[in-house]
């Protein structure tokens, strides 16, 4: 019961004296008159009093709050009342649960180690066995399936980078092996087969130095199909071909006979050396034998040249 000066909102609305046994006094304070007005208009004071008397004291406050909520909703919407709001909220809750289930199913296909099996198995099972020489159409189908599987398999970029580095390393190894074979060929040519004349040894060393130094200047003459320079119009400058295809100057002589002999003398060994240098795939073991054969061919030429010089002298 409220104080003697201020009765409860229910007794004030009903215009009656509020006593100590008033059932409305604890739940309808005097400062909330609208609360009892809504409840009384919808349910009636006698019905509310009867309901509160049937409930326990610890449940009465919740019952009064629910009655006020229902009465307010009914006055706002006389057709549906609070049922309309409840149905709308239930429909939204059902839609949210449906969307949540779909999201979980979609997420399950991308998460976990077993998520790849339902995706990859249909693609591999659908591919028929291809012949040894597939046609262009089957090759295009295989390429398309390959490109479709790559995004799903999610190959990391680090693996591609490792493959590129491996290819670069293999290319460097091949280049090093080729360079080693070339150096081995040069060493075999320079040190193979002892010569009987120091003139031929000096000539071989000079040819190796000319090959390492690159192209020398060519003052005059023209290159023929065989790779040798022809004589100029004056006939005073004769140029030969050094080892490896480099053109070098030959000392000029006044004797045309000796010039022809020098050209003929250089023609055979240089062609033989060119065959050795420009075919690196052959083994380097028969190189000393070839050098000895070349020297045996040049020895009769040098002896005949010395005999002719003695006759002329």
Curated annotation (Swiss-Prot):
Keywords: Developmental protein. Residues 280-302 have a biased composition (Low complexity). PROSITE patterns: LOB (PS50891). Residues 245-313 are annotated as: Disordered. It comes from the Eukaryota. Disruption phenotype: No visible phenotype; due to the partial redundancy with AS2. Gain-of-function mutants iso-3D, iso-4D and dsl1-D (T-DNA and transposon tagging) show flowers and siliques bended downwards. The keyword Transmembrane does not apply. GO terms for biological process: leaf morphogenesis; petal development; proximal/distal pattern formation; regulation of DNA-templated transcription. Expressed in trichomes, at the base of many lateral organs, including branching points of the inflorescence and floral organs and in the distal part of the pistil at stages when style and stigma start to develop. Also detected in pedicels and at the base of petals and sepals. Belongs to the LOB domain-containing protein family. Controls the proximal-distal patterning in petals and the adaxial-abaxial determination of leaves. Involved in the repression of the homeobox gene BP. This is LOB domain-containing protein 36.
